A protein has these predicted regions:
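Rossmann-like NAD(P) dinucleotide-binding subdomain of oxidoreductase/dehydrogenase enzymes
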Residues: 101-205
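N-terminal Rossmann-like NAD(P)+-binding subdomain of aldehyde/semialdehyde dehydrogenases
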Residues: 1-108
Length: 205
């Protein structure tokens, strides 16, 4: 019998290390790179529209295809169009006022920059919307993402895990389902930013 090395990094830790190294190698992706990522995400949604609806229905026990399209799929597609339209402006430096009495002749600028690796904890309700819409703005901002799905979204998580690697490399995006206490470990990872949708009580755990 071979014993596992307790000091060996977990799959989550390895994923974070991979993405952080990729971020440090290319910390400020170009406008063209970000647009390409957004179009790739939109292509994934369009090419798997029916599969996304089927996965949601399986996870819910039953859910109207029209509800999923109207509440989740179409808003995600439209959100990407919105980001593509405004991305160039979002990336431009923004001027800020200066206290001219103390800093006469000085100028201020805020330069938008990626933060690095962003974690996303997705709830069971509206999980397509609450995973793909955050990814839209994570990629628009030039970041990388690790996504943890709900234990009640097994079919959707499996769809993501099976299909998304054909669209994004692991150093850009990885998705995890809720197995073996993944949620607790995921929430404790030292992300550069963490997005969580849920109750305040759960968020404090």
């Amino acid at each position: 019998m071979t014993l596992a090395d307790p000091s060996a990094p977990s799959a989550l830790e390895s994923a974070l290390a991979l993405q952080r190294a990729a971020y440090l190698a290319d910390p400020v992706p170009s406008l063209a790179r970000r647009r390409a990522d957004l179009r790739t995400l939109q292509r994934f949604i369009r090419e798997h529209k029916q599969a996304l609806c089927d996965a949601i229905s399986a996870d819910y026990g039953h859910r109207s295809r029209h509800e999923t399209l109207l509440a989740e799929i179409f808003p995600a597609i439209d959100g990407i169009d919105h980001a593509l339209k405004h991305l160039r402006g979002w990336m431009k430096p923004q001027r800020r006022a200066v206290d001219w009495r103390n800093f006469f002749g000085a100028t201020n600028r805020v330069i938008p920059q990626p933060v690095g690796v962003v974690g996303v904890i997705v709830p069971w309700n509206f999980p397509v919307n609450l995973s793909l819409v955050p990814l839209t703005y994570i990629f628009a901002a030039g970041n990388r993402a690790m996504v943890k799905m709900s234990e009640n979204s097994r079919h959707l998580a499996r769809l993501y895990i099976d299909k998304l690697p054909a669209y994004f490399p692991p150093e850009k995006l990885q998705v995890f389902d809720e197995t073996g206490g993944v949620g607790v470990e995921f929430s404790r990872l030292p992300f550069d930013h963490l997005l969580f949708t849920g109750s305040g009580a759960t968020g404090r755990l």
